C-alpha cells in the first residue's frame, strides 16, 4: 500500500510540473512581436493577442523574444485559443 501511495504521489507531482511547463510556454504568446536590433531579414510569425491569430513579421536575427515562430503552424499549435480579455 505504501508503494501505491508513493507512485501515486510521483504521478501527481509530475502532472503538475507538466501542466505548469505548458502554461509557461503559452504565456510567450502574450508577448508583443520583437524584431530586435540586428539587420537580418527573417520571415517569422508571432501570435497577435488582439486578433487571436498568427501573423507574419520580419525578425532581425537577435534579441527577439519567445513569441517568434519559423512556421505559422507552429505558432498556431502553441498559441491556439488565446484571446485578450474583453476581445471581440
UniProtKB/Swiss-Prot annotation:
SMART domains linked: KU
Role of this protein: Dual-function toxin that inhibits trypsin at a molar ratio of 1:1 (Ki=107 nM) and inhibits mKv1.3/KCNA3 potassium channels (IC(50)=6.2 nM, and inhibits 80% of currents at 1 uM).
Pfam family, one: Kunitz_BPTI
Molecular function per GO: potassium channel regulator activity; serine-type endopeptidase inhibitor activity; toxin activity
Recorded GO CC terms: extracellular region; extracellular space; host extracellular space
Cited Gene3D superfamilies: Pancreatic trypsin inhibitor Kunitz domain (4.10.410.10)
Protein name according to UniProt: Kunitz-type serine protease inhibitor Hg1
Note: Negative results: has no effect on chymotrypsin, nor elastase, nor the KCa1.1/KCNMA1 potassium channel. Shows weak inhibitory activity against mKv1.1/KCNA1 (1 uM inhibits less than 50% of currents), hKv1.2/KCNA2 (1 uM inhibits less than 50% of currents), and hKCa2.3/KCNN3.
The organism of origin for this protein: Hoffmannihadrurus gertschi (Scorpion)
Subcellular location field: Secreted
